[in-house]
């Protein structure tokens, strides 16, 4: 029975200094028909409210209010293909017999993506289940997963002019920051720094997932990734003010109005920078020849030495033949650290706060002490900048391509750009027929290829997806290209 049911059993406890209540809660869908279930509990007033709600819905004059995109400046017209109007399932069936992408289908997928983001916009980010699957008891607890899924889902909010989606994303972040600060303190003993978990329910974000194969407590790059859409929001709209009526947020921060730059971006960037400032330890370093070293009591690095970023985790992979995913010098970490430091120095040069010249000098010194990217015999960027690790390309994630997307480090570095392109080629070849059914992996590759200005590869990836079984008739997508997971992604 519910805890608010006055007829339910009550336990009275007297003269206790403290009480510990251990409960176990589970879901069930084995409740039978509603009428049978109601008869078993008909003496409980709890169901009066349910009956009232059902009767109100039956009597209500319900009108459908379509979600309005309201983006007159956003349009995609490809031309060609079939003439006439087709239902979604008709287009999907037609696509099965066409070698090339049907333009009408691609247009509709684009607008459907805009619709999905607009429908989710305003108060939070989209979660794994979205609004689109029809049930909530899904895989991965229908969570907000922040090592690829949320990131890919919000990747187009700024370039598409979805202002409300950007604001909702920031509310999503602001709810979590206190827990992020606590995570950094509990895992690493850091002060005024942030460390994010892989999953959140959208309200709390404590670090609760620890595993030798998925050691997300050592996923260092997450906060930098989550920061980038806010950075892009400022680039898109300039200085802006957002307002919330969320009581919990107002209570948490003591206000309902936030300056995006001063109240959201700059404080989070400073905490993210503080993380990278504190993780380096001179006792763990690589020498002039790139060999990993440990020297107890070492207090500073020599000119040709670099920090080891240790521990490190490259979601969700581990080196070939290595027993653990807890590693060092993940390329994702190196890239995220460089990106955050560059954003931080850019912020300092913009705000020119007292002592900013010294702070810029310290940040640039830290940048020089970070490890460099390493390259394998094929010329691909290595997922771990360590001589001791072998590449493991039979994997769905491409976290090591962070320099291309979401960062912009390949834009003016042709060697790094070529290395990222080769890394995708290696992944596609060595992971074929293994765990290459994860749709987020293919979309991630398409985003990287777009940044690398490789139009043919972007087209090939999209063509693979439209010929897979990824799409529901709503045109929303499954986690897997064979629709084996039943969860919107």
Regions found by a protein language model. Name each.
Residues 36-39, 93-100, 139-140, 155-156, ...:
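Second-shell loop/turn segments in exported
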Residues 25-27, 121, 132, 136, ...:
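Short, flexible loop/turn elements at secondary-structure junctions
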Residues 146-149, 158-186, 190-193, 203-205, ...:
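Active-site core of glycosidic bond-cleaving carbohydrate-active enzymes
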Residues 115-125, 138-146, 165, 178-183, ...:
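Secretory-pathway/luminal and periplasmic proteins that interact with or process carbohydrate-rich
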Residues 126-158, 171, 268, 272, ...:
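Zinc-dependent metallopeptidase catalytic helix centered on the HExxH motif
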Residues 106-120, 223-232, 267-276:
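Extended, hydrophobic/aromatic-rich amphipathic alpha-helical segments that build helical scaffolds
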Residues 1-144, 163-167, 173-183, 388:
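Acidic/polar, glycine-enriched structural segments that form the non-catalytic walls/loops
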Residues 128-143, 191-264, 277-362, 403:
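The feature captures the catalytic groove of carbohydrate-active enzymes
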């Amino acid at each position: 029975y519910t805890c608010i049911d006055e007829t339910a059993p009550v336990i009275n406890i007297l003269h206790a200094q403290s009480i510990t209540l251990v409960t176990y809660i589970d879901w069930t869908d084995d409740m039978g028909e509603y009428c049978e279930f109601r008869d078993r509990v008909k003496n409980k007033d709890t169901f009066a409210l349910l009956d009232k709600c059902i009767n109100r819905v039956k009597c209500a004059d319900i009108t459908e209010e379509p979600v309005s995109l309201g983006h007159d400046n956003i349009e995609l017209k490809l031309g060609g293909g079939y003439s006439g109007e087709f239902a979604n399932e008709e287009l999907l069936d037609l696509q099965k017999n066409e070698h090339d992408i049907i333009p009408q289908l691609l247009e509709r997928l684009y607008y459907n993506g805009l619709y999905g983001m607009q429908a989710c916009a305003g108060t939070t980010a989209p979660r794994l289940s979205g609004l689109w699957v029809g049930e909530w008891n899904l895989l991965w607890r229908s969570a907000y997963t922040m090592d690829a899924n949320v990131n890919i889902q919000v990747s187009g909010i700024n370039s598409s002019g979805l202002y409300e989606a950007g604001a909702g994303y920031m509310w999503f972040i602001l709810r979590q920051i206190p827990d992020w600060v606590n995570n950094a303190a509990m895992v690493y003993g850091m002060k005024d720094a942030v460390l994010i978990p892989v999953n959140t329910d959208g309200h709390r974000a404590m670090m609760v997932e620890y595993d030798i194969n998925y050691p997300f407590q050592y996923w260092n790059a997450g906060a930098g990734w989550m920061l980038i859409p806010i950075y892009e929001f400022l680039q898109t709209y300039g200085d802006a003010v957002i307002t919330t009526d969320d009581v919990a947020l107002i209570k948490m921060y003591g206000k309902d109005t936030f300056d995006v730059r001063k109240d959201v971006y700059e404080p989070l960037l400073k905490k993210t920078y503080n993380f990278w400032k504190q993780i380096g330890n001179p006792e763990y370093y690589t020498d002039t020849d790139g060999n990993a070293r440990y020297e107890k009591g070492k207090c500073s690095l020599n000119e040709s030495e670099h920090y080891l970023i240790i521990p490190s985790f490259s979601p969700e992979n581990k080196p070939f033949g290595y027993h653990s995913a807890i590693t060092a010098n993940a390329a994702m970490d190196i890239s995220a650290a460089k990106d955050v430091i560059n954003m931080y120095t850019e912020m300092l040069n913009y705000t020119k706060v007292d002592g900013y010249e010294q702070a810029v000098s310290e940040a640039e010194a830290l940048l020089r002490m970070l490890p460099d990217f390493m390259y394998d015999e094929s010329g691909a960027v290595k997922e771990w900048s360590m001589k001791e690790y072998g590449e493991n390309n039979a994997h769905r994630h491409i976290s090591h391509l962070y320099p291309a997307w979401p960062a912009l480090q390949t834009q003016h570095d042709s060697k790094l750009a070529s290395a990222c392109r080769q890394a995708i080629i290696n992944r596609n070849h060595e992971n074929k027929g293994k765990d290459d059914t994860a749709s987020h992996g293919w979309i991630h590759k398409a985003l990287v290829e777009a940044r690398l200005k490789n139009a043919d590869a972007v087209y090939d990836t999209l063509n693979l997806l439209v010929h897979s079984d990824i799409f529901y008739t709503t045109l929303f997508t499954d986690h897997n290209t064979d629709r084996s997971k039943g969860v919107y992604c």
